[in-house]
Curated annotation (Swiss-Prot):
Belongs to the cation transport ATPase (P-type) (TC 3.A.3) family. Type IV subfamily. The chain crosses the membrane at residues 72-93, 98-120, 304-325, 364-381, 922-941, 956-975, 1006-1028, 1042-1064, 1071-1091, 1109-1133. Its EC number is 7.6.2.1. This is Probable phospholipid-transporting ATPase 11. It comes from Arabidopsis thaliana (Mouse-ear cress). The keyword Transcription regulation does not apply. The lineage of its organism: Eukaryota, Viridiplantae, Streptophyta, Embryophyta, Tracheophyta. The gene is ALA11. The active site is at 429 (4-aspartylphosphate intermediate). GO terms for biological process: phospholipid transport; protein localization involved in auxin polar transport. The keyword Metal-binding applies.
């Protein structure tokens, strides 16, 4: 590519807007009006007029807090959690005389938990702060007003500054391109940081500025004004005018260089700062993704509210009883106070028998504080710690690392780990997600002749379906075996056209035009390796790159592009030698989703004007001239065959353009592109529509987007897990169906329910152009087809058959199916089918379908995609998984979890998802179990003491229970436990349904753990009380008091809750042993150390262990007996459950324990305990065969009964 500046060249108007004197008849009404009020004084950032505008500076802050706001704002964030707020209230109440314990013992645990969360917030925010400092201190050359550019920090830039950005530097703000190192003011930009796309974009300045501003010194006298739109988040549009040298020139997105994009393949550019800081488009787009919370977390909130209700109910009951007892105290004893030790004569206390109602009210507040231990204060912070550690395991899983691209899995948020184990429906994009998005040119049709002998994966799959033998596939592999190195983007084999043999074909002239079109009709950028001389290409899409590579392999090598021309080498038909040709590039009629085609207008070396065009078959065939349809019939046949083979097709055509016609077109085209009106795009489309007509057909291309490695096996395994899989794609129905067969999403035995609008009646209405009639007929047709499909499902269900159905619907039909009146019908039909494929669906439709499934089923949905068109779907789903593939990183940046290949979804869900769900479920249940155990002992002791608000335990015993003596084991459970190993998660994928049906966190299981806690507390309290009631506790004749009873009960609680944890764990690691037995040991260590402190601090715990508990045999015997008795119910329940109604994971654990894990009969027996039959994938095919033959059915039933 030419690097020097070229002067006095005739500049074309290819990509941008030709600088010209203003036509004041144009509509400039937007500029200066609402939404278009920005005025930029170029080269005068400090002028009074500019200062009055008061635009924001270029300093960017992404931090959540400032130094001044951190403490108040982070405290507010912490106390928004209802549990934290509750503990704050109880902490404040502890400062009053109502408190049953010392204030410091109440406030210290809360302070610890809040401080831990705030430290986490501070660390995360400091990371953002460091990024801000690094970015704001970057340097760029800024014009000082005297023709000299000096390096300044990004943070100091102002609107109106002129900057010089050099190769491989980032743009510091949104800049208006004035000129570049190229004479015609083009530059190449990489927008990876904006939209994730790695291909280069072409930008071009106005001719007026590029011809006047060449060197640094040219900017000394620059005076210009930009009037444009106000700051907004739209990355793809920009409207404004430049007032320069008495001209008013229209501006578009082509002249705008966006902050954080990078200058590539261009030595330097000059630009004027238009938007700064938080006004730039990239920052305007930096909104937080939608906040997502897992179902378990939302249910946990409900449990917290339930516990609040229990606490207040207990406090209310205790207060009523206390009030009655206080009033009856004197009545029963003839006016004498029986409980004299409560000192009712003391005005500072609240137990006056003469004021019993007030005593009850005061007691209520005391009880609320005393029973606060029912609420697990460390639950939230423990779960956050566990989820972060779980995310680290996901991120560092070597089995989800894609070495080829150096891409590991990345959990971008840890909030949804357990949700990965509850997915009911997967909604997947196709291109780049199920397929590689690495296009290979494999076949083509030229002049009605089909070329290319390659066999696609879909054709191989179709052959296997038809013949039912893997030998067919083996034979096909031999056919496509090729010698020589693999060429990226090219997998074509046909000796008739390779190595220059195309010149010997009957239609060599047509073949030459076809290959020339591939070499010229594109926007690819060539890059030549100076060492080897080989040419590689930067293209806007993998398809386009494949076309250019194919042209090169056919002997038409595109090797250079300038703003005005395209250069390529080809084999000359006349001389038989390779020659270089240069076509002058006049216009590029760019592709968009509405046009479904792109064209270029070029002038060849003979001076002829040519329109070269490629596009979708449905828009290209209708634009053919009468004399251009010579090969149409054969080409249509070949296109249909290619679609059946799962290939992506484009039609190639051309025509010669009359000189006068082009002059008129160029005039109208330039006026349309230079207009500053809201309908600019429609004007351009209207003009190009007139040019892209009367085309002469050359042929069609067929490129294969191969399935990613492991996709069929992954889909098969997910289907065995009972997960439904929907595919939402923009491809044609035929292509999507055949890809569905190739990846086993569809199978031969399935009945296909196809909904489309290809009926003769609707086609006739379309030809007549009756819009209202078309809409009415289309809506009616879609509804009728849905009702017919539902009737098929109902009939199959009533017949108790094993038929599986697949729903396939196109984008037009989907528009009507998603209407409010019919979407429930559509959802009922779709959820009754084993597979759903939505074809020709738009990004908006993908998001709407995802929303419908999520809200309509109430189950967890996962969306997976790789492109910008999948962002809405990813954000709408409960979990968004981004594929870090070829289409850039925009999907990844909008996702919750990123993986490199679809096949990693199997391990992410079946292993990590199941483990995280199982761990978090057990962890939360255990948290409430241990707190109920501890809290009920406090309640029982208070009831035993006539609700006198006397705590059963020392203040510090109360405070440290949740923090030091019981939290670490439960955190270890949440991080390390495995109910079954990864191997068995794969072997028995139906285990995953435990999460889908939420069996491990059902209300039945939660309530069961709560009752277990209540029983444990009852056993501990009454056994300890009765064991110590009438005994002499030491040689001096002293009986057990509160400190001894409390110490014994506390010891039993610590032992029992930790032993219960040990019994609940399925997979022990050395770390779990350390934290469980270490927590118990730490209790004894703490008791000795705390008891050795002065009595003024340790109060009744002073030497209680050394002098009272440890020497007494009854203490140790009671502890041992209570532990045994309190854990018996759990043993009994587990034994009965394992014997009579085992969970799925328990069945797997048992056959592994019995040594039957490798016995095919036992393995198949467990699989037969399906919660949901497998209806897609290879396994479904085998299962269908088994059902038809009835093999092993009776034997499996016998085996299960015996088991």
């Amino acid at each position: 590519m030419t690097k020097c500046r070229r002067r006095r060249l005739h500049l074309s108007n290819i990509y941008a807007f030709k600088g010209r004197k203003s036509n004041f008849q144009e509509d400039h009404s937007h500029i200066g009006g609402p939404g278009f009020s920005r005025v930029v004084y170029c080269n005068e950032p400090n002028s009074p007029a500019a200062e009055r505008r008061n635009y924001v500076g270029n300093y960017v802050r992404s931090t959540k807090y400032t130094l001044a706001s951190f403490i108040p704002k982070s405290l507010f964030e912490q106390f928004r959690r209802v549990a934290n707020f509750y503990f704050l209230v109880t902490g404040v109440l502890s400062l009053t005389a109502l408190s049953p314990y010392s204030p410091i013992s109440a406030l210290l645990p809360l302070t610890f938990v809040i401080a831990a969360s705030m430290v986490k917030e501070a660390i995360e925010d400091w990371g953002r702060k460091k990024q801000d400092i690094e970015m704001n201190n970057r340097k760029v050359k800024v014009h000082d007003g005297n023709g000299i550019f000096r390096r300044e920090g990004w943070r100091d830039l102002k609107v109106g500054n002129i900057v010089r950005v050099e190769k491989d530097e980032f743009f510091p703000a949104d800049l208006l391109l004035l000129s570049s190192s190229y004479e015609d003011s083009i530059c190449y930009v990489e927008t990876m940081n904006l939209d994730g796309e790695t291909n280069l974009k072409v930008k071009q300045g106005l001719e007026a500025t590029s011809s006047a501003l060449h060197e640094d010194s040219d900017f000394k006298e620059l005076k210009a004004v930009v009037k444009c739109e106000d700051p907004n988040a739209d990355l793809y549009t920009f409207v404004g005018t430049l007032h320069f040298e008495e001209q008013r020139l229209p501006l578009s997105i082509t002249q705008l260089l966006l902050r954080d994009s990078k200058l590539r393949n261009t030595e330097y550019i000059y630009g004027v700062v238009v938007f700064t800081g938080h006004d730039t488009k990239v920052i305007q787009n930096s909104t937080d993704p939608p906040s997502k919370r897992s179902r378990i977390e939302r249910k946990m909130d409900k449990i917290i509210y339930l516990m609040f209700g229990v606490v207040f109910l207990m406090s209310f009951i205790g207060s009523i009883v206390f009030g009655i007892e206080t009033r009856e105290d004197r009545v029963r004893n003839g006016g004498r106070t029986e409980r004299w030790y409560l000192r009712p004569d003391n005005a500072d206390i609240f137990f006056d028998p003469d004021r019993a109602p007030m005593a009850a009210v005061y007691h209520f507040f005391t009880a609320v504080m005393l029973y606060s231990y029912f609420i697990p204060i460390s639950l939230y912070v423990s779960i956050e710690i566990v989820k972060v550690l779980q995310s680290l395991f996901i991120n560092n899983d070597i089995l989800m690392y894609y070495e080829e691209n150096d891409k590991p899995a990345h959990a971008r948020t840890s909030n949804l780990n357990e949700e990965l184990g509850m997915v009911d429906t997967i909604l997947s994009d196709k291109t780049g997600t199920l397929t590689c998005n690495s296009m290979e040119f494999i076949k083509c049709s030229i002049a009605g002749t089909a070329y290319g002998r390659g066999i696609t994966e879909v054709e191989r799959s179709m052959a296997m379906r038809s013949n039912g033998s893997s030998l067919v596939g083996d034979d096909l592999d031999v056919v496509v075996d090729q010698s020589g190195p693999k060429i990226k983007g090219f997998n074509f084999l046909d000796e008739r056209v390779m190595k220059g043999n195309w010149v010997k074909q009957r239609d060599a002239a047509v073949l030459q035009k076809f290959f020339r079109l591939l070499a010229v009709c594109h926007t690819a950028i060539p890059e030549t390796d100076e060492a080897t001389g080989s040419v590689s290409y930067e293209a806007e899409s993998p398809d386009e790159a494949a076309f250019v590579v194919a042209a090169r392999e056919f002997g038409f090598e595109f090797f250079s592009r300038t703003q005005n021309g395209i250069s390529f080498r080809e084999l000359d038909l006349a001389s038989g030698k390779t020659v270089e040709r240069v076509y002058r590039l006049l216009n590029v009629l760019e592709f968009n989703s509405a046009r479904k085609r792109m064209s270029v207008i070029v002038r060849d070396e003979d001076g002829r004007l040519l329109l070269l065009s490629k596009g979708a078959d449905n828009v290209m065939f209708e634009r053919l001239a009468k004399n251009g349809r010579k090969f149409e019939e054969k080409t249509r046949e070949h296109v249909n065959e290619y679609a059946d083979a799962g290939l992506r097709t484009l039609i190639l055509a051309y025509r010669e353009v009359d000189e006068n016609e082009y002059i008129e077109f160029s005039k109208n085209f330039n006026e349309a592109k230079n207009s500053v009106t809201a309908d600019r795009e429609s004007l351009i489309d209207e003009i190009t529509e007139q040019m892209e007509r009367d085309l002469i057909l050359l042929g069609a291309t067929a490129v294969e987007d191969k399935l990613q490695n492991g996709v069929p096996d992954c889909i098969d395994k997910l289907a065995q897990a009972g997960i439904k899989i929907w595919v939402l794609t923009g491809d044609k129905m035929e292509t999507a169906i055949n890809i569905g067969f190739a990846c086993s999403l569809l199978r031969q035995e399935m009945k296909q329910i196809i909904i489309n609008l290809e009926t003769p009646h609707i086609k006739a209405l379309e030809k007549a152009g009756e819009k209202d009639a078309i809409e009415h007929a289309s809506r009616e047709s879609v509804v009728n087809q849905m009702e017919e499909g539902k009737a098929l499902l109902t009939a199959s269900s009533s017949a108790s058959s094993h038929e599986a159905f697949a729903l396939i619907i196109d984008g037009k039909s989907l528009t009507y199916a998603l209407e409010d009146d019919f979407k429930k019908k559509f959802l009922d039909l779709a959820t009754g089918c084993a597979s759903v494929i939505c074809c020709r669906s738009s990004p908006k439709q993908k998001a709407l379908v995802t929303r419908l499934v999520k809200s309509g089923t109430g189950k967890t949905t996962l969306a997976i995609g790789d492109g910008a068109n999948d962002v809405g779907m990813l954000q709408e789903a409960d979990i968004g998984v981004g594929i870090s593939g070829v289409e850039g990183m925009q999907a990844v940046m909008s996702s919750d979890i990123a993986i490199a290949q679809f096949r990693y979804l199997e391990r992410l869900l079946l292993v990590h998802g199941h483990w995280c769900y199982s761990r978090i479920s057990s962890m939360i249940c255990y948290f409430f179990y241990k707190n109920i155990t501890f809290g009920v002992t406090v309640f029982l002791y208070e009831a035993y003491t006539s609700f006198s608000a006397q705590p059963a335990y020392n203040d510090w015993f109360l405070s440290l229970f949740n923090v030091f003596f019981s939290s670490l084991p439960v955190i270890a459970l949440g991080v390390f436990d495995q109910d079954v190993s990864a191997r068995y998660c794969y072997k028995f994928p139906l285990l995953y349904q435990e999460g889908v049906q939420n069996l491990l966190f059902s209300w039945k299981r939660i309530i069961g753990w709560m009752f277990n806690g209540v029983f444990t507390a009852l056993a501990i309290f009454f056994l300890c009380k009765e064991s110590l009631k009438h005994q002499l506790y030491n040689p001096n004749g002293k009986t057990a008091g509160r400190e001894i009873l409390g110490g014994t009960m506390y010891t039993c609680v610590v032992w029992v809750v930790n032993l219960q944890m040990a019994l609940a764990i399925s997979y022990f690691t050395w770390l779990q042993h350390i934290v469980i037995w270490g927590s118990v040991a730490f209790w004894y260590i703490f008791l000795m150390i705390y008891g050795a402190i002065t009595p003024s601090f340790s109060t009744d715990a002073y030497k209680v262990f050394i002098e009272a508990l440890a020497p007494a045999p009854s203490y140790w015997l009671t502890t041992l007996f209570v532990m045994f008795f309190a854990l018996i119910p759990f043993f009994v329940f587990k034994s009965v459950q394992m014997r009579f109604f085992p969970g799925y994971h328990q069945m797997i654990q048992w056959i592994r324990y019995e040594g039957h894990s490798n016995d095919p009969e036992f393995v198949e027996m467990v699989r037969q305990r399906s919660i949901r039959p497998t209806t897609v994938g290879f396994t479904a095919r085998r299962a269908a065969s088994v059902r038809r033959s009835g093999r092993f059915h009776d034997q499996l039933n016998k085996n299960f009964i015996a088991f």
